[in-house]
Amino acid sequence: MPGTPNMTYKFTKAIIRKPNKSIHKALSSQHLNPSYEKILDIHKNYINCIEESGLKIILLDSLEDYPDSIFVEDPALIYKNNIIILNPSDLTRNGEAKIINSEINKYFENVFVVKHGTIEGGDILNINNHFIIGLSNRTNKLGAETLSNLLTSLGATVKICQTPKDILHFKSECSLIDDDVILVSNRMAKLDYLKSNYKLIELPIGEEGAANSLRINDKLLVPDGFIEAEEILTNKYNIIKINVNEIAKVDAGLSCMSLRW
């Protein structure tokens, strides 16, 4: 909760999946098709940046039958030494959850599975032992409450909020970047719960894409191409810019491509 030393962005390991050639079929609200070759370049740079941040990479094989499978954050959540398998909203992604369970459960002490409702990792913001779950088109009330009950039983506290309309995932336009400091878009800055409990750094209209940044240890990975965001963050943080244009075509951001702990 606010006011406590933050360990949320202190990591030693990351799970990442190799890109799949079928990614051009990934879910996209924009109906755009990313280039596999360009995704490969982004992915390579992403891994390099995470390794430079001091993390050991666990690299999973690509899954051609699952176009969205490179985005490993959605079907699973890590808390303490537990892995929680989530329940993605689109039926095409349910198989991903089962597969990633079999691939990574050996790295964790306990495995839990959310069986009721729909919930995706992109709607879950972790801040120490506190979680904010955003209701969205991908995460419904039953899924949020099911996960909330599970996390509470593991010692966490949870707040369920409504994601603003037309934002795909709660974290599409916000990210934890420091102790109790959340980087937000103009729309996310209006959420009463965030305003009341955290220090917000609000990005200007037009730079919403930079709000999904990724704090890893002493570095802050920031989507490239957002000039004002860079100016706001450069003096306060050790930023690394990463081109995410191609994954943005399928509504994805920096946090989507890894599970970190």
Locate predicted features:
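The feature marks the mature, well-folded catalytic cores of soluble enzymes
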Residues: 2-261
